[in-house]
């Protein structure tokens, strides 16, 4: 399997930083606005495009992003999100599978999946176990957006050997340039401390303004922007300290 790199050994902690700090950035909620999508696509470096399947420009933008050399992922709606593709607790697995198939068909070239909302759904152990097995079968990775402390998604991915990473920092819960800049700097500090950081933002004008200004400065600050496939290899499917102990995700 392309991303299945890991045979976890009990008690092995995540690798200590070796001097190089790595960062991956995901922009969620794409496919809604050609103007915002194009501005996001123009961000420098390997920024990941997370595209919602139930948006008017999902398929066209996925093709455009792939052609531009960006990593494309499916931004999968999960409860409390609504719509024809959304996953909800209590929906039979056969219907969840149908919705996943339909969503992936709307976002060609998807290399992986992350959850849109999903605070209730990512806590559903049976559904997450099935999803991680299905993603592994399809040679896709999973990004746990960690919209809930009760998530078991990354733990189930790790248990099954499905390639995955988890979000460390949300950039734009507060939509001001000052707050977004602080969050980005928090991500930089975290990358330096633990060797890597995964950040998620949205195509808000304020977020794009900050990233357009700050991304060209990352290298001077000792941080290398890498794509998610490289981040998965760098982290070797291990949990960061905020998400588990000794490299193991908390499995609530």
Descriptions of predicted regions:
Residues 2-5, 11-252:
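Catalytic-site microenvironment of enzymes
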């Amino acid at each position: 399997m392309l991303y299945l790199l890991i045979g976890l050994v009990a008690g092995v902690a995540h690798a200590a930083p070796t001097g190089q700090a790595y960062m991956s950035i995901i922009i969620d909620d794409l496919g809604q606005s050609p103007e915002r999508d194009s501005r996001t696509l123009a961000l420098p470096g390997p920024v990941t495009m997370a595209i919602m399947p139930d948006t008017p420009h999902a398929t066209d933008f996925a093709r455009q992003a792939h052609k531009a050399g960006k990593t494309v992922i499916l931004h999968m709606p999960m409860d409390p999100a609504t719509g024809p593709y959304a996953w909800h607790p209590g929906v039979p697995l056969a219907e969840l599978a149908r919705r996943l198939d339909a969503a992936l068909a709307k976002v060609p070239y998807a290399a992986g999946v992350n959850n849109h909302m999903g605070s209730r759904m990512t806590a559903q152990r049976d559904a997450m176990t099935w999803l991680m097995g299905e993603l592994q079968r399809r040679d896709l990775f999973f990004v746990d957006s960690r919209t809930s402390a009760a998530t078991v998604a990354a733990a189930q991915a790790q248990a099954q050997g499905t390639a995955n990473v988890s979000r460390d920092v949300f950039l734009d819960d507060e939509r001001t340039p000052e707050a977004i800049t602080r969050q980005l700097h928090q991500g930089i500090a975290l990358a330096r401390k633990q060797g890597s950081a995964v950040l998620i933002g949205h195509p808000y004008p304020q977020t794009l303004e900050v990233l357009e200004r700050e991304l060209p400065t990352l290298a001077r600050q000792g941080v290398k922007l890498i794509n998610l496939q490289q981040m998965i290899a760098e982290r070797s499917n291990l949990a960061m300290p905020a998400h588990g102990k000794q490299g193991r995700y908390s499995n609530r």
